[in-house]
From Swiss-Prot:
GO terms for molecular function: DNA binding. Keywords: Repressor, Stress response, Transcription, Transcription regulation. This is Heat-inducible transcription repressor HrcA. The keyword Repressor applies. Belongs to the HrcA family. It comes from Lysinibacillus sphaericus. The keyword Repressor applies. Negative regulator of class I heat shock genes (grpE-dnaK-dnaJ and groELS operons). Prevents heat-shock induction of these operons. NCBIfam families: hrcA.
Length: 343
């Protein structure tokens, strides 16, 4: 159990180190407003905090820096909510001012603005595309033998896929096909699209549309591409280059390589957990992230779908600011997407 004096000193050290990235000494602490202890007393308390594992001594300075245990204690017990200034709020609100239709546009813009506001790397997962439901299906001919299939989902997600038309496929056939597809597929999830096509739609197409047997295989690969496409959005991938902890290019390269692997990126998230979660250093499962902190949260799209947000930075992350920003943006995203679905 830490004393009140130790708590106060630990908080000052961590707050100062987050701002400066420089070891914090006793004289520096003694000059802080609200600190009434002598440098000698502070040195003794710092030595005790080091012995308890909350601080570490560097080789190049007599000052101390927080340990991973120190950061964990700080996050769990000393982190106080930080207000967001009007400029930050205005920048966040700009995400929603354009009245963009597609969910992906809003998520991509959110990733960029989060990285700008935090100076760290942001990653946003879109909602699970497989759970989207078909809202509208259309086919637009581009030439006598080529067309584009367009699927619009209930979340505003739009997919376009080119394919070749069968020989002798007429405009009348195309119109009949689009009507049948919309009649049978609206409300069907992309996950169930193939099953619905094969179980219900194909037989109807064969009755009313010439070359239906030839047409279906041509569109099947396009549907597979839609379902398998991962929706991950990045902001500020190279922001870590600006942090003194990552002047070692090998460390940065390892993290960038991790971000290129979809399964590794998805493992950073806890999509089934609500609230904000902070993992520090070795608490991350990935070896590449041992010098990083990862803060994650989720946002909702209606009652049945979720997306997720992660901020990646050094363990010397400005936790107060990141948590405050994530708290605002996750609620704003949820509100915006819920409103869009109800309209």
């Amino acid at each position: 159990m830490l004393t009140n004096r130790q708590l106060q000193i630990l908080q000052v050290i961590i707050d100062d180190f987050i701002l400066s990235a420089q070891p914090v000494g006793s004289r520096q602490i003694s000059k802080k407003q609200g600190i009434t202890f002598s440098p000698a007393t502070i040195r003794n308390e710092m030595a005790d905090l080091e012995e308890l594992g909350y601080l570490e001594k560097t080789h190049t300075s007599s000052g101390r820096v927080p340990s991973e245990k120190g950061y964990r204690f700080y996050v769990d017990h000393l982190l106080s909510p930080q207000g967001i200034n009007s400029r930050d709020i205005q920048q966040i609100q700009s995400i929603f001012n354009d009245r963009l239709v597609e969910v992906e546009h809003i998520i991509r813009k959110s990733a960029n603005i989060l990285s700008e506001l935090t100076s760290y790397t942001s990653i946003l997962l879109g909602p699970d595309v497989q759970r989207h439901r078909v809202k509208r299906f259309s086919i637009v001919p581009l030439s006598s033998d080529t067309a584009v299939a367009i699927i619009v989902t209930n979340n505003g997600h739009v997919e376009n896929r080119l394919f070749n038309l069968p020989p002798d496929f007429t405009a009348s056939d195309l119109e009949k096909m689009v009507n049948i597809l919309n009649d049978r597929l609206i409300g069907v999830s992309l996950e169930e699209l193939h099953k619905s096509l094969e179980a219900e739609v194909l037989a109807v197409l064969q009755q009313h549309v010439q070359s239906a047997d030839d047409f279906y295989p041509r569109t099947r690969n396009s549907d597979n591409a839609i379902i398998q496409k991962a929706k991950i959005f990045y902001g500020g991938k190279t922001n870590m280059f600006n942090q003194p902890e990552f002047h070692d290019l090998n460390k940065v390269r390892m993290i960038l390589d991790l971000m290129e692997t979809t399964s590794q990126v998805q493992s950073l998230f806890h999509p089934n957990e609500s609230g904000i979660h902070i993992r520090i250093g070795s608490e991350n499962k990935q070896l590449e992230m041992e010098n990083c902190s990862v803060i994650t949260t989720t946002y909702s799209i209606g009652d049945d779908q979720q997306g997720a947000i992660a901020i990646i930075g050094p363990t010397r992350m400005d936790y107060k600011r990141v948590v405050a920003l994530l708290d605002v943006i996750r609620l704003d995203l949820t509100q915006a997407f819920t409103k869009n679905r109800s309209e």
